[in-house]
Amino acid sequence: MKKHLLCFLLAATLLTGAAIGVGAASETANLVPKNVFAKGSYTASNGLTIPYRYYLPESYKASGKTYPVFIHMHGNGSRGTDNAKQISATGTELNTAVFRSDYDCIMIAPQCPASDMWIARDAYPGSDKFAADIADGTLERAYLNAAMELLGIFIEDNRDVIDTSRIYLSGASNGAGAAWAMVALHPHTFAAVVPMAGTGQPQGPVTEAGAAAIAARYLDTPIWTFHGDADPTLLIKGTDVLVAAIKNAGGTKLEYTVIEGGKHNIWPTVAKMPEVIDWIFEQKNDRFENTMLPDPAVRLDANRDGNVDLADALIMLQSIANGGAHYTLNTVLDTLKFIAAK
């Protein structure tokens, strides 16, 4: 299986410009099966390296077909550098349910190290601090920014096989906080978002003023959010306040389900709701903008010497030939076009 995938993915890269790289997947049999999620890592323009796992559906070989993308942002329990827990630990059940569903899609799951987290404990979406932090359209969260840059580049470099009207996002706990933040920062990117226990109190803390300040950023994106009413970690009041603010701002694309008696780890319950997965894949986005993509001078500077030149194109070609997951032929062509236009 591993050898077969390696040969296929290498051939796919040389012929179609698809992202590649194969490694062992989850060791947890009841979650994601082994050897199906390939390994990758990306060094962002801020110098941080993000490990990630991605999955290409069996029908990926079909010529001319494009696929939706399902992105999962893990919670604090899946942090690390093993490039495994974000697809194998608790909190990834919805990711697994999507994998086992009848929907063919490309899947990607970045990992944050244990030394940090996607969203600061005192700045969850809906808090006064979060509203102040993103007032200029940016957020100083280094690993979240690196992950968003990775996702933007992954989508752009594989644009030949990705249906950009169907970019889906989910998150659990701190990863759900990241999902809320990603929509606020990139309101035209995602077709559907499922945050689970993603903001609250006393962490956050979510306030009516903080929620009202960002509510308009969520009006155009279909969101189905979940929270347990007995959550002792992120109290449900935070989600209540944020949801109310969005609805008061005129939001009509927001669904909110309270899990009665649900503690913090509600993700297994959500994953057992087939209507959630059906809802996700029914959503389409006709206003897609890849605003997660860094400036071309950053994206195409493979050797990070501050200049895009033929040396960068050669590095990309060598990486592709060696079976690396960093670049595709689309990236090489974009580099040559950038050089020619200088």
Predicted regions and their residues:
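A domain-start/cap signature at the N-terminus of enzymes
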Residues: 21-69, 105, 174-177, 182, ...
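Active-site machinery of serine-nucleophile hydrolases
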Residues: 76-145
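Gly/Ser-rich "nucleophile elbow"/oxyanion-hole loop immediately N-terminal to the catalytic nucleophile
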Residues: 59-65, 121-173
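The conserved beta1-alpha1 loop
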Residues: 68-74, 197, 227
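Primarily recognizes the serine-hydrolase "nucleophile elbow" in alpha/beta-hydrolase
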Residues: 156-209, 214
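Sec-dependent N-terminal signal peptides of Gram-positive bacterial secreted proteins and lipoproteins
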Residues: 4-23
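The feature captures the conserved acid-bearing segment of alpha/beta-hydrolase catalytic domains
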Residues: 188-285
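Alpha-helical segments with a strong preference for the paired helices of cellulosomal dockerin domains
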Residues: 296, 302-342
